[in-house]
Amino acid sequence: MKLVIQVPCLNEEESLPATFADLPRSLPGIDTIEFLVIDDGSTDRTSEVARELGAHRVVRFPGRRGLARAFEAGLREALAMGADIIVNTDADNQYQGQDIGKLVAPIIERRADMVIGTRPIDQIEHFSPLKKFLQRLGSRVVRTLSQNDVPDATSGFRAYTREAALKLTVLTGFTYTLETLIQAGQKDIAITHVPIRTNGKLRESRLFRGMRAYIQRSLGTMFRVYVLYQPLRFFWSISSVFLIASAVLFARFVWIWIVTPGPPGHIQSVIVAGALAVIGFIVAVLGVIADLIAMNRRLTEEILLHVRSTRARDTSSREDPT
């Protein structure tokens, strides 16, 4: 069984030596371990340092594309290298490499296809109280959307089977952690989590410049991915609000018309009720159309899965003719 440990990097020449020194060279149940570095357009010697440290493969972008794109490129390259298991870790040595054995154990034992390393959020000293609260809140939202019980949704310390990696597609350009969890839940990928340890903080995060921007982009990612995979539920939920409001206003008009003698009044209630009903029906129809598009997308994903499997198999066969 072959394990590929991928490390997305951006200007990490100083932290890479500590990260590589912490990575395991052998593990029970694993025959081969190889290291893959994805250089996201670094302006320092990240790629050269990675090769000097013994990286088996270095993928370098000519310019910065973002963490999500680096992560997905790593998955595709790891598959081409013939990986049976892929572990993703950070280049800033945030996660302890000694825990990779714990991370891959559920996969080796065939208990999961995707394993998340759960950090002790409350014990991380450099996390502010606000950040700890938002981490817990965000994880709770993702658990609801993805229908899994992972307590640390933003952890980047993860292990994937070859089959899980083939199924995942990163659509947003911000961060992969939330999106892939929601995707995995929608695609029935077996997920579990294990407790892990963290190292001290080496530098500030390069993923976002402020908590507010991070929250906004994370919420946008979760919204887009949820609507992508649950369009009918989303649009019909909105439609039901308009239709219920329309029914209440129309019932109010009928009640007043029955109990009040003389010519009917409150015609404005009927007008507003009619407008709300039209909006509700339009939104419901949009939900049906979006659901049909989603069904077509699922068929496309099946074709993409077949193409990826064939391409990865052919590439790994050429690299390892034995």
What kind of feature is each model-predicted range?
Residues 12-27:
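Short, well-formed alpha-helical segments that are part of the catalytic scaffolds
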Residues 39-47, 93:
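A conserved acidic beta->alpha catalytic loop
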Residues 57-80, 85-87, 97-174, 178, ...:
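Acceptor/aglycone-binding surface of glycosyltransferases and processive sugar-polymer synthases
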Residues 14-18, 44-48, 57, 69, ...:
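Residue-level preference for short helical/loop micro-motifs built around acidic side chains
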Residues 31-41:
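Short beta-strand/loop segment that forms part of the nucleotide-sugar
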Residues 2-4, 34, 179:
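Cell-envelope/extracellular polymer assembly enzymes that use nucleotide-activated donors
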Residues 4-8, 37, 60:
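Short hydrophobic beta-strand elements that form part
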Residues 171-322:
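Hydrophobic helical membrane-anchoring modules
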